[in-house]
C-alpha cells in the first residue's frame, strides 16, 4: 500500500547551502520531518551545481514522518540575469534596457530549463525564455 501523503512543502534553497536555519528548519519541523537528513541529502545532490544558485525543491511529507524531494531547475530570471551580467531587471522594461542576450545564450538557458518548461520543442522554449528576458528589460537579439 502507498504511504499517506500529509503535505507538500515548496522551498527555494541555495545549492549546497541547506542548513537547519529558517526557512528550512521551521518548514520541515512543523511536519515533524528530520531536518538534518534533508539538509545532507539536498547538499549531496547539489554538489555539481554552482554553489549559492537557488534551487526550487518540492518536499513530499508522509504520515510516517518520512519524506521525498524533487529538485527543479533554477528560476529562469536568475539564469537570465547571470547570462546578461546584470544585478536586477529594469524598473521600466519596455523603455529602459539594462542588458542584451543573443540567440545562443537564450538556447543555453532553454536547455537548462527544458525539463521544467511545457514547450513542445527547443524553439518554443527559446521564445519562452526570450519573453521572460524582455519583461525584465533585457534586449533580445535573433529571436
Swiss-Prot record:
Keywords: Methylation, Ribonucleoprotein, Ribosomal protein, RNA-binding, rRNA-binding. The keyword Ribonucleoprotein applies. It comes from the Bacteria. One of its GO terms (molecular function) is large ribosomal subunit rRNA binding. Part of the ribosomal stalk of the 50S ribosomal subunit. Interacts with L10 and the large rRNA to form the base of the stalk. L10 forms an elongated spine to which L12 dimers bind in a sequential fashion forming a multimeric L10(L12)X complex. HAMAP family: Ribosomal_uL11. This is Large ribosomal subunit protein uL11. It comes from Laribacter hongkongensis (strain HLHK9). The gene is rplK.
